[in-house]
Amino acid sequence: MADLSGIVKAYDIRGVVGEQIDAPLVREFGAAFALLIKPDSPRVVIGHDMRDSSPGLAAAFADGVTSQGLDVVLIGLASTDELYFASGSMNLPGAMFTASHNPAKYNGIKLCRAGASPVGQDTGLAELRATVEDGVPAFSGQPGTVTEQDVLTDYAAYLRNLVDLSGGRRLKIVVDAGNGMGGHTVPTVFGMSAASRSDSGEGGGERRAGLPFDIVPMYFELDGNFPNHEANPLDPANIVDLQAKVREVGADAGVAFDGDADRCFVVDERGEPVSPSAITALVAVRELAKEPGSTIIHNLITSHGVPEIVKEHGGKPVRTRVGHSFIKAEMATTGAIFGGEHSAHYYFRDFWRADTGMLAAMHVLAALGEQDRPLSELTAEYSRYAASGEINSTVDDQIARLMAVKDSFGTRPGVTFDEMDGLTVQLPDGGWFNLRPSNTEPLLRLNVEAADAAAVKALTDEVLAIVRG
């Protein structure tokens, strides 16, 4: 078997279909996963997104699992957080076939243990890779069986039990599904009729009985070729249509989902982006109101405003490395009720510590509807500093460039460092930046925060001059 290091990433398995990933290889991964989880579970739940290659790859994985004597529950088309719901509610390990926001030629597998517990490099992925590279041992016993189960309705009902959407003022909300799985889950969560799900371009939308929302749908047709734009709302180019539609129809807010709908991105009534850090703080405050004094997780790239706001509301902020496996592990250790990342991943204890963009979006809409101010004014409470967003630089030697930055700033009075994840530099005027290597590409990722936009630009320019010099 060829070296699989190119497709086994830090948190999932991902590559170009037909070149790096195909059905025979995926079958081997299914068999290896069955061996990994066999001591703990007799069944595996499998879902897939709308990519052309996903149903076939999911079937191949299921064949590999059953070849080792374990049973399979197929839930069919699903968002990643819907798969996590199935894993959590059934207490089964799971496999989700998706490449998230990557282009159509890609596909991959997100894996979890029972209860939606993460599988990453240190919690099973490295072992899976080794098993497949060495050759999966044959199983001589009876093969497992395959059953099908639709969990979409139960998933929607579970989310609506966590956030009450029925009591607020009536809102008009534009939702851009990006031709991804949000087009599958949003209609059921919000109870939209079949007729209202088409992208008519009209401003009327659909109001669900008991829910005060007019939903204006954009790009709800499931299409893994992403004909309208990439399903990555963190790229500003991919929310231009959403911003324009919000302004056109006079909506109260806009929500965009990525390809597998585990992340959400929000724009306000002006069409202006709301930072994921502000969403993290807003949801944290809502969760702390229910359970005062609880722990909130934030990764080291989220705004410093997040831990400040958490403390002001009686919570305990805990800072972690970037990545879902670190967030989920820290939530388990601390008993945290909620966690947020700069990348618009939001994690909830009551959702098996898994990330769900849908639940975060529901919190934002509930908060908006419970008061009379526009979203821009509501979220201004949670936005304290200016930020650069993530800036990538291609470099020949990541470590050498990191050390050059550290050496430059290390001579300055009052500057402090930490290396929890890459290099974080804290300046005496309150500005700070993080510079960290990509796990999969020859990139350094820079995030800068400071008091205002001018200070952010000056600090960004200074760091990039060293990184790219």
Regions found by a protein language model. Name each.
Residues 43-107, 189-193, 210-267:
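N-terminal small/polar loop signature for handling phosphorylated ligands or for N-terminal nucleophile
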Residues 41-49, 172-174, 294-300, 337:
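Short glycine-rich phosphate-binding loop at a beta-alpha junction
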Residues 72-81, 273-276, 298-299, 320-321:
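Active-site nucleophile and cofactor-binding loops and adjacent substrate-binding regions
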Residues 107-193, 210-249:
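Gly/Ser/Thr-enriched, mixed-charge loops and adjacent short helices
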Residues 1-61, 67-68, 148-171:
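An N-terminal, well-structured beta->alpha segment
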Residues 253, 289-469:
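Phosphate-binding and adjacent anionic-ligand microenvironments
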